[in-house]
A protein has these predicted regions:
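Residue-level recognition of alpha-helix boundary/capping or hinge positions
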Residues: 8, 34-38, 112
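Gly/Ser/Thr/Pro-enriched helix-cap/hinge segments flanking short amphipathic alpha-helices
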Residues: 3, 44-47, 51-170
């Protein structure tokens, strides 16, 4: 990560449905007068790091689009806004309107799991789900209050890459 950037939210999610979680970082400095200092600005570019395997991530740096914009971001909500099978990101910003980063680049197969309890925990908050597919085991949990001024989709999304079937769900 860049020392000149001030991170306000970090989330792992599978941006490309390849079964590996990538990393989104919302940035924006906390002090509006920070521009008095060299190499530091109040609005900053958010970042996306793609999981390239073996514990390594590479930053995806676009030349245009929402990730190229400088904003004062504070939180982010993750979910499939347009219901097309990939995770979109809605970013809460301080000095501008929210930014919807619509994801249209994911190509792998996927499954979405919505849990529904019968008692007081209707949304299944805290439930842990394992998906076994294509020789991989993925684990995710239903979480509430995931980010500042933001709430991510409570449905769990698992990218399956090229796998044609799910072996088991626990």
């Amino acid at each position: 990560c860049n020392r000149d950037l001030r991170s306000t939210d970090i989330k792992f999610f599978d941006v490309d449905n390849d079964g590996d979680r990538d990393l989104f970082v919302a940035n924006g400095h906390l002090e509006s007068d920070v521009e008095e200092y060299e190499n530091t600005t109040f609005p900053q570019r958010n970042q996306l790091y793609l999981n390239v395997g073996e514990g390594r991530f590479e930053e995806y740096v676009p030349t245009d689009g929402a990730l190229a914009l400088k904003r004062v971001s504070r939180g982010a909500a993750f979910g499939d806004y347009d219901d097309d099978g990939d995770i979109d990101v809605l970013v809460a910003n301080v000095t501008s309107a929210p930014t919807l980063m619509r994801n249209d680049g994911a190509e792998g197969h996927w499954v979405r799991i919505a849990l529904e309890g019968t008692g007081s925990n209707r949304a299944g908050i805290g439930a842990r789900v394992e998906v076994h597919s294509g020789g991989k085991v993925q684990v995710n949990e239903v979480r509430s209050g995931s980010s500042f001024l933001s709430q991510s989709d409570l449905r769990l999304h698992f990218g399956l890459a090229a796998a044609q079937a799910i072996d088991r769900v626990v």
